[in-house]
Each structure stands twice: as C-alpha cells, then as structure tokens.
C-alpha cells in the first residue's frame, strides 16, 4: 500500500543521506517515466546517491542525467553507471556531475556508434581536458560520433540538432579513404589509419580516436616536414569546424584516453565508498536529522488517524 511504501522511504532516505519526502518525490518522477513502483523506488535511491556523491545542485538535474544514461546503457545497473562516473570524477580533471552532464547529450549517439560506458567516459574526460566545459564536450562528442558514422542519416540528424554539416562526408568508403590518406605519412606502415576493423566492421568512436591520438605527434611532425595540413583536414573531417577543438583535445591526450578506459573498468563500489564519506559529513548528518524529524511527524499523524 501507499502508506507502507511511505513508511519504508524513511529508512531508504537515511541510507543515502536525504529525506523521505525527496525519495517519494523522486520515486514519482521515475514512475512518470513508466517504471513500476518497485523499480522507481530503486531508481530514486540511485538518483539520490548520484546527487550526494557529485556536485549536482539538485535532484532534478541528477535524475535527468541518470535517465539519459540509463536509457542509453540499458544493460547496465544504474549504480554501475554511478560507480564509473564517481571513480573517474574523483581521479581526473572532470567532476562526476560534469561527466553526467556531457553524457546526457552524447550517450545515445555514442552507444549507436558502438561505444560502451568506459569508452564514452574516456572520450568525455579527454575531450574536457583542455576545454573544461562538459556541456560543450557532450555536444562535441555527439557530433564526432555522428560524423564518423558517415551516412546521410547521420548528416540529417546533425542538421536537425542545429550542428553544421559543411564538408561532412556521407559515404563510408570516402570517409575511410580520407582518414587513411591524411594519416599515411604519419603511420609506421605507410598505409594510414583504418576506421574499419579486419572484418570490415566499424571501429567504435573510442577506438578510432585512440588510434588517431597515437599518431597525433607524428601527424604534427610530418605536417611541418612536408608542408602538409593533414591535422586540420582530420579535425574538420571528424568534428567539423565548430567542434574541432573537442576533437583536438582528445587527440592530444592519448595517455589519458587509455588510462581512463582502464581505470573505468575498476570502478565497482566507488560510489558506496564516497556515499559513506558523505554520510559522515555535517551535511549528511543534517539530512539524516531532518529525515528523522519528518518520520516522527509521520508517525504522530499516523497514530492520530487510527
């Protein structure tokens, strides 16, 4: 019953450092998105954990980001997502909420382009290293992943999003040839970097950007030696003029790309550890106190109605 559910929210709120009222409101938000009461109660708990281990201002922002990410990464438990964001947010120059904000815009496009969460977080962290503007990084990654798909549909999607599509290549063979030609001089075998794997399938956006990042120093060196302009050609091909700074930030941070990808895979339990620190803090204790006051009045009113 609703009354029984309300009674359980006080313990849930205590466990994550918020109030039963916020858990109840949050549960209602998730139910409006089509979740059952049990699912929504669990999602509300997770959203409040994200809020308390990040720098989000309020539960609405945390929920909005978690909705986008959990819809994109349907095979992952919401806490698995929060673990990765918290772990990388604690160890690199991007905040947990910064990662979530960027992925709110880019997760769907990145999943379509075969990037798992660890790859998406790596691209986001490296893309933010120079710009330090997560919302622009999210929009930039969405653009990069769609431009690297190289289809008319991807071009239309970018156009619908208000992104520039000038010079966008919309056939896979031409996109492949352009990137190989621009990286021939810089590659050790003289063949250039291939955006397709040995089976002829697309590499993920992360695999492509990591491969190009590994060649970055050599591309710059060869451009100087030969008087070519392959770096600019590459940046405009994969990102367009308006988002090329995001692509440049990724290509200049090859070691970060790799280390974030490796660290992200070892994130289990990260959010719970951070949450425990929050619960021991003044803010955490105050939230629990407020929650217990609400529970007291809930029981008083409940006993008076019997």
Task: Enumerate the predicted regions with their spans.
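Short, Φ-rich (hydrophobic/aromatic) sequence segments
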Residues: 49, 81, 87, 243, ...
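A short, structural motif
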Residues: 1-83, 87-100, 110-118, 130-136, ...
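Extended alpha-helical or coil "stalk/linker/tether" regions that are enriched in polar/charged
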Residues: 121-259, 293
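Heptad-repeat coiled-coil alpha-helical rod/stalk segments, highlighting residues on one face
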Residues: 48, 59, 63-66, 78, ...
């Amino acid at each position: 019953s609703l009354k029984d559910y309300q009674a359980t929210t006080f313990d849930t709120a205590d466990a994550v450092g918020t109030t039963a009222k916020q858990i109840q409101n949050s549960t209602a938000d998730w139910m409006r998105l089509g979740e059952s009461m049990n699912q929504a109660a669990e999602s509300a708990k997770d959203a409040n954990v994200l809020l308390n281990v990040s720098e989000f201002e309020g539960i609405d922002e945390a929920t909005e980001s978690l909705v986008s990410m959990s819809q994109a990464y349907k095979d992952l438990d919401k806490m698995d997502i929060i673990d990765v964001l918290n772990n990388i947010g604690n160890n690199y120059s991007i905040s947990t909420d910064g990662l979530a904000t960027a992925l709110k815009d880019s997760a769907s496009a990145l999943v379509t382009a075969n990037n798992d969460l660890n790859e998406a977080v790596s691209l986001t962290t490296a893309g933010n290293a120079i710009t330090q503007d997560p919302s622009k990084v999210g929009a930039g990654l969405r653009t990069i992943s769609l431009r690297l798909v190289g289809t008319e549909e991807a071009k239309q999607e970018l156009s619908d999003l208000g992104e520039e599509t000038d010079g966008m290549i919309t056939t896979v063979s031409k996109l492949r040839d352009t990137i190989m030609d621009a990286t021939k001089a810089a590659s050790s075998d003289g063949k250039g970097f291939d955006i397709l794997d040995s089976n002829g399938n697309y590499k993920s956006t992360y695999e492509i950007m990591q491969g190009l990042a590994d060649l970055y120093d050599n591309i710059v060196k060869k451009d100087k030696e030969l008087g070519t302009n392959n770096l600019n050609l590459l940046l405009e091909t994969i990102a367009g003029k308006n988002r090329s700074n995001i692509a440049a930030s990724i290509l200049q941070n090859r070691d970060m790309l790799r280390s974030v990808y490796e660290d992200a895979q070892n994130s289990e339990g990260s959010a719970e550890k951070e949450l425990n620190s929050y619960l021991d803090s003044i803010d955490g204790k105050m939230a629990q106190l407020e929650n217990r006051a609400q529970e007291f009045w809930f029981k008083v009113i409940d006993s008076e109605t019997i």
